[in-house]
């Protein structure tokens, strides 16, 4: 496997290292073979979990196979955060990345906040716009989103339901 541009890293409560990278940024200069004729030269899945020794524990991620019942994967992967309940939060900073995603630490989709490709600007309480970072406050179970690439704010949602709380 090859890594594309690495755009996020976090350490969970078990001291595991989580990495998100951009598989679509590998090219012929990275010895990436477009016809995938060798295992060595394929991009890794976007989300990677490592132990402290650098051993790969698992990998997952990418577009949902059924968008009607799934989620909208980021156009450009950007940012990863593992919360106090071991949920993995992801964001993107591509032009259509107006949502954030929540998964279990095994890669099962849980929640999407926002609709991909829709933004109403900095006063929009339903969508983000190229989120810069995510953090969850355990005491209130609120997710704080640094929504600063496309908007200019920090917006807060309920981490379980995705309901808007405040800006």
Q: What is the predicted role of each segment?
A:
Residues 1-167:
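Eukaryotic scaffold repeat domains enriched in small/polar residues
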């Amino acid at each position: 496997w090859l890594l594309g541009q690495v755009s996020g890293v976090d350490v969970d409560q078990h001291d595991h290292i989580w990495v998100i990278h951009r598989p679509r940024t590998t090219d012929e200069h990275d010895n990436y073979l477009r016809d995938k004729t060798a295992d060595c030269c394929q991009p890794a899945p976007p989300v990677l979990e490592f132990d402290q020794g650098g051993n790969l524990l698992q990998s997952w991620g990418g577009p949902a196979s059924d968008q009607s019942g799934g989620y909208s994967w980021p156009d450009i992967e950007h940012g990863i955060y593992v919360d106090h309940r071991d949920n993995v939060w992801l964001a993107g900073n591509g032009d259509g990345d107006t949502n954030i995603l929540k998964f279990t630490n095994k890669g099962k989709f849980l929640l999407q906040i926002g609709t991909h490709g829709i933004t109403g600007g900095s006063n929009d309480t339903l969508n983000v716009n190229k989120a810069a970072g995510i953090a969850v406050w355990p005491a209130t179970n609120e997710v704080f989103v640094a929504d600063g690439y496309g908007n200019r704010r920090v917006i807060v949602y309920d981490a379980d339901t995705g309901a808007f709380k405040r800006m």
